[in-house]
């Protein structure tokens, strides 16, 4: 009897679990009036739309998102034929949510042709949302009647570029925090926020602006403390937003207590970068691993080609390296790499950037990502080198294309000593020039 009762309860429980699971993974079914978006149709349905589009960025596990579902479907039915009401699973399609700086759920954005997306911050009832949409539609109609927009694309032209610009702030979680932050040698500034926090929402555009302006110089990241309770507890975060600075001592981050504006955050970050920066480095290019480490992530890599050790001796080479260290120290706050290589040690690199023969010392500014370089055209002196770095930072001017892929070979590092001159006794002129007598005899025999 007990076995029969047990069997009879298995099916309904399984069905219930399946229903709950299915509901959690798809808030909007195929019969829903809400348009379901994915990365593959986002551009055609939203960005290329000629009308107003309301987009909900949701996560299936989010309780507030589940509560909003019937309201959002009512909005879709109300605005049918007037505006498009859509939704995208931002948890499954993180690339799209990151592009638009979505950090909490649900987030509602209104896309109007010719303008950047608008964050909806009003009440989450059907009437309020619909009224907000109608307001945007009226404004769009007025602009079109006044000839201010062509209405060909949703956010076209320069505004589309601005709208789609992703945030440089890195989304951090329990799976990547240690690898990216605590185990890194780089300076990190991290915002700990909660999606429901009003101050966090106010900070969001300033944080994005600061992150984008500091890209390539200082790493900025953010942690959703509602989703990452373990990280929140680990760093004793008690209020939102909390901004911590992870400098040289990653185990003891320092709180940021300055103004919550992009300019203030940027100024503070650059000050921290200077105080946390280690000594300048100019590394010998002894193989592809050095190239990747020093130049792979650098905005610009400055490669110096120094004379053969037999020509400059150790004293001369050290003077060149002192000059390069002086230049590297001047720009150590910038995302540049500085490497050097002895004449003839990297023949393929020399060939591709037009260095070689008797043109040592030489320097080129290398942008491997763009496949371009610019050569130093003035004298190899500290002042000229510093001016060259400044000019290269402006980009474009004097750049030349690099044909093909550079082959960097593995070489032995310089031992810091003078080069050894090969004794004349170790070879004969006959070995180099051939034996004239033998050549003469062979000629006579041929005759």
UniProtKB/Swiss-Prot annotation:
Q: What is its EC number?
A: 5.3.4.1
Site feature Lowers pKa of C-terminal Cys of first active site, where: 124
Listed under catalytic activity are:
Catalyzes the rearrangement of -S-S- bonds in proteins
**Residues the record marks as carrying a glycan:** 173
The record's listing under SUPFAM superfamilies reads:
Thioredoxin-like
Which InterPro entries has this protein been placed in?
A: PDI_thioredoxin-like_dom (IPR005788), Thioredoxin-like_sf (IPR036249), Thioredoxin_CS (IPR017937), Thioredoxin_domain (IPR013766)
Note whether Endoplasmic reticulum occurs among the keywords: yes
Concerning PANTHER family, the annotation shows: PROTEIN DISULFIDE-ISOMERASE A6, PROTEIN DISULFIDE-ISOMERASE LIKE 2-2
Q: Which family does it belong to?
A: Belongs to the protein disulfide isomerase family.
Q: What does this protein do?
A: Acts as a protein-folding catalyst that interacts with nascent polypeptides to catalyze the formation, isomerization, and reduction or oxidation of disulfide bonds.
Protein name, UniProt field: Protein disulfide-isomerase like 2-2
Give the classification, highest ranks: Eukaryota, Viridiplantae, Streptophyta, Embryophyta, Tracheophyta
Q: Gene of origin?
A: PDIL2-2
